[in-house]
């Protein structure tokens, strides 16, 4: 099935129009900063950082690169300017040096003049990783040490694509992979006695990063065994079978299935299993991943719809998952995608500052301009629907 055939043309055009309108309202770094100031008054969480991929100008550079409007370079410059006041002294993907490198690498595909800066940024990233002393004692590990959002899994995703591959980059990637192999062994990613299953902070994200590296030929001793152990554990702690296969947010679990989302629970776990299946050629595992996501999307269609429209914990994240699975051959995801896309497009409200509001897990409703939990991420998702192909930025959500 071609990606272009996943949505009716009229719906794809509507998605593109909404994405363009969001892009217009975030057309300059000054507008984005003003939106961030407004959003900060609506929440008790501090989230906006100029150089951040998740909630900053780096993420908005991606927005404008993919909307086809020539504003991306202005946001790149704004992101680098922000580092003068708040230097990126940590390597993470969504909030650190790896994220800025990811955005700059994407923009550099159109703007080769940024390539020298990208090389320097990758060297900075490598040095930060080499200088990082991640804990290796059971019980001393926090999710930001290993996870996709802040830790070694997300950093691995970016280092796998770094070019040129210098000796420092090689050493840094080796350190990340070896740490993830250790974390994956015997449940070392437990935090306060709980093992997270999901993509953003749990086993699925670790597995996806290790699988992406494996597929690219970047391997260390024990990596395949770690993939097998993570996969076996995820399948063992899942509940039900076939289309009823689902996962709690953590093990042990306080309640049932995690809310439908990219970040936690069934959606992210299915994506992690799909990444492993594609890296190892395991068609049986691919079928189980397809069935698990199909079941989740069926439950969403029956009314279990996330309140937020955003990528992280909302509807846009489910659209990303459905598109990804459909493009890899899932008939269930292909059937579900138009309905999800239509719901996301219909939710847009031009009377709102950014057309969409994030419903935070704390209960706040926020006009967030960012990528992971805001309007920029929704616009990027809608642009992918409009163009009918998998955009490169999805790699930060679904490593491959």
Residue ranges and their predicted role:
Residues 1-9, 58-69, 100-113, 154-166, ...:
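Well-ordered alpha-helical scaffold segments within catalytic/enzyme domains
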Residues 11, 49, 72, 89, ...:
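Residue-level recognition of alpha-helical structural elements
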Residues 14-43, 68-87, 117-139, 172-189, ...:
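Long, well-ordered core segments of solenoidal/helical folds
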């Amino acid at each position: 099935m071609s990606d272009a055939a996943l949505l009716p043309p009229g719906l794809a055009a509507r998605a593109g129009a909404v994405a363009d309108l969001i892009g217009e309202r975030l057309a300059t770094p000054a507008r984005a900063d003003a939106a961030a100031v407004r959003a900060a008054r609506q929440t008790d969480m501090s989230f906006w950082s100029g150089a951040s991929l998740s909630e900053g100008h780096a993420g908005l550079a991606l927005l404008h690169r993919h909307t086809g409007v020539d504003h991306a370079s202005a946001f790149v410059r704004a992101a680098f300017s922000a580092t003068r006041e708040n230097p990126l002294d940590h390597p993470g993907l969504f909030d650190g040096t790896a994220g800025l490198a990811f955005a700059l690498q994407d923009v550099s595909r159109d703007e080769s003049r940024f390539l020298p800066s990208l090389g320097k940024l990758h060297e900075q990233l490598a040095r930060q990783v080499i200088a990082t002393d991640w804990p290796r004692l059971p019980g001393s590990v926090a999710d930001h040490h290993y996870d996709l959002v802040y830790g070694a899994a997300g950093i691995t995703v970016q280092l796998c694509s770094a070019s040129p591959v210098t000796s420092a980059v090689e050493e840094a990637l080796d350190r990340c992979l070896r740490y993830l192999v250790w974390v994956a062994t015997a449940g070392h990613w437990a935090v306060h006695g709980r093992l997270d299953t999901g993509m953003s902070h749990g086993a699925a994200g670790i597995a996806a990063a290790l699988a992406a590296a494996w597929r690219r030929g970047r391997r260390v001793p024990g990596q395949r065994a770690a993939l097998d152990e993570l996969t076996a554990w995820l399948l063992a702690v899942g509940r039900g079978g076939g289309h009823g296969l689902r996962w709690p947010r953590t093990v042990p679990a306080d309640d049932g299935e995690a809310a439908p989302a990219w970040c936690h629970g069934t959606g992210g776990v299915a994506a992690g299993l799909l990444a492993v299946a594609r890296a190892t050629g395991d068609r049986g595992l691919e079928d189980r991943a397809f069935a698990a996501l199909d079941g989740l999307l069926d439950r969403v269609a029956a009314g279990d719809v996330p309140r937020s429209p955003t990528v992280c914990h909302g509807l846009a994240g489910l659209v990303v998952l459905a598109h990804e699975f459909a493009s890899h051959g899932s008939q269930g995801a292909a059937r579900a995608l138009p309905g999800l896309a239509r719901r996301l497009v219909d939710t847009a409200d031009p009377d709102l500052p950014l057309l969409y509001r994030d419903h935070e897990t704390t209960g706040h409703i926020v006009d967030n301009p960012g990528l992971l939990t805001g309007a920029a991420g929704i616009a990027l998702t809608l642009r992918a629907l409009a163009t009918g192909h998998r955009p490169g930025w999805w790699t930060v959500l679904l490593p491959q």
